[in-house]
Amino acid sequence: MKKFKSLFLSLFLMLNMSIFGAEKTIYVGAPKAPPVLPVLRMIETNALGKDYKIDIKVWDSPEVLIAMVQGKEAQFFSFPIPVISKLYNKGLNVKLMNINTWGVTSLISKDPTVKSWRDLKGKTLYIVLKSSSPDAYTHYFLDKEGLKEKRDYNAVYANKAEIINIVAAGKADNAIMIEPDTTAILAKNPNFKIIVNFEEEWQKYKGDKSAIPTAGIGVLGEVAEKDPELVKKFNEEYAKALQWVKENPEEIGKLAKEKLGMDAEIIKKSVPKMGLNFVAAKDVKKILGEYYKIMLGYDPKIIGGKIPDENLYFNK
């Protein structure tokens, strides 16, 4: 009987550690992009209290993110909006907690003949992060202008680090970039100009002033089921940290440099352009519903074939 109890306790501890990590470490899978900045502030302030340590696992492509989710390498993740819907529709138990990044994407070019989407005909376009929000919106906008990939233009995909190096080296004339990388490239090479602001383009096609949802924080479903109060606390503290980031661009720049090796000055300059605005998942269903309907009508594969149901959203 004692052996059975000992075995049961060992299995329980192993299961608990597989979900929460040793010594109650909370892992957040995120790219070096706007959604990670509030997490840095949470680490700095020990936002979840003395019982929890927060650590970041960096992903640099949706493929790496998906592998991290499948392997349960973290409990919380920064998700591009199309990716979390795809994973959910494939049967993975994930929950969307919030949307925190809106817009943030631009078409930039150093080709003087490129002044609109239509001018990309016959040209090569570098796109950051295949299957991400920027990728989905890029193809949606180009399709609206009557341009099809391969037939009318060539798309080349790269992760964030790769595309920065390619563009900075002058090996690309046209690129889809996100902040803070756009600010960094424009500072390094004044020949590049912003041709299309994605939020303005989205508003043009929708006929209103709605923001364009780009990324949010999500959580493994089993974590939300096991400890909903922890997830609720994380969401609340993330919202506070995001507001601090917006109000303290210089300080978050220093923190991003210290923790992730990001350029402090570029972060400082780009914070106002990052589209940082916290909206809890329970309050964003209508906005995302409209987005999903548009993408479903355009290309169902972008969101995994169907509009996710209510169980995608964390409602605490």
Regions picked out by a protein language model, each given a short descriptive name:
Residues 1-8:
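Bacterial N-terminal signal peptides that target proteins for export
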Residues 8-16:
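Bacterial N-terminal signal peptides
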Residues 17-21:
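Sec/Tat signal peptide C-region and signal peptidase I cleavage site
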Residues 47-51, 200-210, 276-285:
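Short, solvent-exposed loop/beta-turn-alpha elements that line the ligand-binding surface or hinge
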Residues 81-83, 156, 161-255:
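Pocket-lining segment of extracytoplasmic ligand-binding domains
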Residues 224-298:
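Secondary-structure end/capping motifs
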Residues 289, 293-316:
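Conserved C-terminal helix/tail region of periplasmic/extracytoplasmic solute-binding proteins
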